[in-house]
Every structure is written in structure tokens, then in C-alpha cells.
Amino acid sequence: MNTLKFTKMHGLGNDFMVIDAVSQDFTPEDAPIAAWADRFRGVGFDQLLVVGRSETEGVDFRYRIFNADGSEVGQCGNGARCFARFVADKGLTDKKEICVETANGVIFPKLSDNGMVTVNMGKPRFMPSEIPFVPESGEGDDACIYGVHLESGIQPVSCVNMGNPHAVIVVDDVECAQVRETGSLIEPHRQFPERVNVGFMQIVSRTAIRLRVFERGVGETQACGTGACAAVVAGIRLGLLDEGKTVEVILPGGTLYIEWACGGDVMMTGPAETVFEGELAYS
């Protein structure tokens, strides 16, 4: 029986178990991820992040993400910031800006001296086939609003892919939003073949929103980086937020800063913090 070193990190309360697969042998497909994620009998986390070397020329690292239920996903914004902080703190790179390969493309995290991390999250995608989403109300491919057919009626959502699928719902007050009830109905809905993250967005001003997110395979979390990006993009497309301005996204775990100009890449800035270092038995 060998030991496996790991680091517990969080980005605004969205917490991660981070494993260095560059300096030690680790195969996530063989790991009991769901057991490790258990908050009473394991390490406890929303997602497992695996740091590996990329085989692609010009790319510094490969970034793999696994939900608490063991399912692999293509992107995680809060995780991307923790990933960048981890490789810098562990001396795996001396670069301030790194090139990181994910299952859904390349991202470019940049570390600031003040502890904040800015990540170029790439371009959002909107085509139903790119979400993926199956329209059932006759909407066109470029619609800003689609209908999700629930037993209680049709729920309007804005669909955005930020490396993973998001459905954004505009609400009057996030504190009163039925996040768990509605999120648990939409997350596995037949119109989202790969399931979906569900965001509940309250407009505070042209440059500020409040947001709660019911994450795919996890449930509601303290913060969701890609969810914050998706919400701001949706708000701009709906004419509710200012394009090209920095939008303050207030989540239960803290605040992120998102900027997007139509047709461009989405920029996300926020903190990443280490909680503790640990070891566990692993064979």
C-alpha cells in the first residue's frame, strides 16, 4: 500500500482535492473518487483536480476535473484558478501565465502578485448542438431564451457552453429562488443530453449580479466560476448587463469579476487558496 499526496484548496468555498500526477503516479480512473469526496468519511470536496503534463507542444499542463460522483467534466473555472496557484506554489512552473489543456480546449491562467488569478476562459458557445440542448418549443439556433419543459410548465432559460453546459435563469431574488427544487429537475432533464449546470441570476445593476448555481453531479455549491461566466454572458445577450465592462458576480462564497465583449473571450478574475496538505493510502 502506497501513500498519495494531495492538497485541499478552494476558490470562494468551491473546494477541491488537487493531486500532482506530474511528480507521483496516479490514475484517476482507478481511484475511489466518490469515497474520497465524502465529507464525513473521506477528504470531502466538490471536485477532484488532476495536474498532469501535456503531450501537446507549447502547452504546459493537462488539467482533468472529476465531480464528487466520479464523473469527468470538461471545465471548472474556480478549479482553473486553484490549478494555477497549485503549480506555482509547488514549483512545477515559474511562469506567471501558463497554457493549460482541458478536455474542452486550452485556457490561459495568469497569476497576479496580489494573490488573484485571472483566467482566459475562451469563447462562449450558444448553438443547441454545442451545449448540448434539444429545443422542443421551435426556437431557432441563435435564440437567447429557450424553454425547458417541466411538469409545472415551461421554464425559460439561457443556454451557454463555457467548456461545460449551463442553463441560466433570471430571478427577482436569489435568496428566495428554488435552487435545489428547480435545479434538481433541470440538471438531469431530457433536453440536456449531458446534464447541465443551472444558474439562478439576480440583476443588481448593469455591472453587478447575485448568483447561485446548482452544479451538475454536485448540487448547489458556494461558487461556480464557469457558472459566473455563463451568467454574465447570458445577461449581456439579454441586454441586462453592460458589454465590455467588468461585472461583479456575488456568490454565496464570495465575489468573482467577469468581463466579456460579444465575439471575444471571457475573462474571469478571483482568488485561489490552499486549505491544507495531506496524504492517504492508495494502491
Curated annotation (Swiss-Prot):
Cysteines engaged in disulfide bonds, as pairs: none
Places the protein is found: Cytoplasm
Binding-site list for substrate: N14, Q47, N67, G77, N78, N164, N197, E215, R216, G225, T226
Catalytic activities: (2S,6S)-2,6-diaminopimelate = meso-2,6-diaminopimelate
Residue(s) at site: Could be important to modulate the pK values of the two catalytic cysteine residues: H166, E215
GO biological process: lysine biosynthetic process via diaminopimelate
Primary localization class, coarse: cytoplasm
Top-level class of the enzyme under EC nomenclature: isomerase
Known pathway: Amino-acid biosynthesis; L-lysine biosynthesis via DAP pathway; DL-2,6-diaminopimelate from LL-2,6-diaminopimelate: step 1/1
MF terms (GO), sorted A to Z: diaminopimelate epimerase activity
Enzyme Commission (EC) number: 5.1.1.7
InterPro entries: DAP_epimerase_AS, DAP_epimerase_DapF
Alphabetized Pfam families for the sequence: DAP_epimerase (PF01678)
Active-site annotation: C76 (proton donor), C224 (proton acceptor)
Gene Ontology cellular-component annotations: cytosol
Subunit organization: Homodimer.
Task performed by this protein: Catalyzes the stereoinversion of LL-2,6-diaminopimelate (L,L-DAP) to meso-diaminopimelate (meso-DAP), a precursor of L-lysine and an essential component of the bacterial peptidoglycan.
Family: Belongs to the diaminopimelate epimerase family.
Descriptive protein name: Diaminopimelate epimerase
